Amino acid sequence: MIMRHAEADMPWGTSDFDRPLTPSGHRDAPRVGRWMLEHGVVPEMIVSSSALRTRQTCTWVCDELGEKAPTASLEDRLYNAPTRELLSVIGRTPETVHSLLVIAHYPAVQDAVLSLASSDSDYEATMGISSGFPPAGLAVLSTDKPWAALDGADAVLRFFIDR
């Protein structure tokens, strides 16, 4: 699963890295966690950008997942990362992990999903992501390939939740 952080504020004098979620972001992020529970797509591992808005998004998602939530790890390299870096982080996932959630930033989240999505992907989900990847958007992909072997069009995009 690949998720974009929820909507972030831009307070005067705050660095981009330290931007907090807006009230809307604080409402939308937990909805994604609830959707995961309702649809049985709870991650075994979560990797989040270390920026404040992604950490806050991750906290809300984990709060909704409750005791099913794994301990999230923060990855500095996901902040403003190009697509290849996001894919590299995914590729380093231990093979014992079967379900991963990455929480990162636009446009890398959109580009990574479109890079990974095969022609067998859900048409509407693919079209939705092609049109944009809004804050708190979530793409759910599946694959039989090992994480380290993912190099493009290797996964089936099953769902795209755009808030």
Indicate where each model-derived feature is located.
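Active-site-proximal alpha-helix that buttresses catalytic centers in soluble enzyme cores
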Residues: I2-L78, S118-D122, F133-A136
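Glycine-rich phosphate-binding loop signature in dinucleotide/nucleotide-binding domains
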Residues: H39-V41, T93-H98
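Short, well-ordered alpha-helical microsegments
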Residues: T54-R55, T83, V109-Q110
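Hydrophobic packing residues within well-ordered alpha-helices of enzyme cores
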Residues: T57-V61, L86, A112-V113
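Short phosphate-binding loop-to-helix
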Residues: L78-E95
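A glycine-rich beta-strand to alpha-helix segment
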Residues: H98-S119
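Domain-level recognition of soluble alpha/beta enzyme cores
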Residues: A117-V156, F160-D162
